[in-house]
Amino acid sequence: MSTENDVAIKVIVELQAKSGKRAELKNLLESVAAKYGPGQPGFLGSLRYEVLDNPNILVEIADWASAEVRATAMQQAMADGVYAPLEDLLAAPFRATVIRQLP
């Protein structure tokens, strides 16, 4: 029987770029996904989107094998400073929502 930590999850991350920084934010997200995504244990892929009525908001939806492997990967990424460049590009703190499919 699988536990809650073994269930595949999706993470929806909403990022609002500072005025004039949207292209830089988009490029940074693509670069981080290409460099760190494929080698991350438990990372199943991600797609990036734009919000139609607010083009400064970008959304990334990532698939992970479990909440536990994502938490481990995020702790390591933060320790390594992977997301440090976001500070200069974001108008507000990013928002991350972790979801799983209903049983």
Task: Please give the residue ranges for each predicted region.
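Short, surface-exposed ligand-recognition loops at beta-strand->loop->(often short) alpha-helix junctions
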Residues: Q16-N27
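Non-catalytic surface loops within mature trypsin-like serine protease
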Residues: A17-S19, S66, R100-P103
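An amphipathic, aromatic/His-enriched active-site/gating alpha helix that lines ligand/cofactor pockets
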Residues: S31-L44, D63-T97
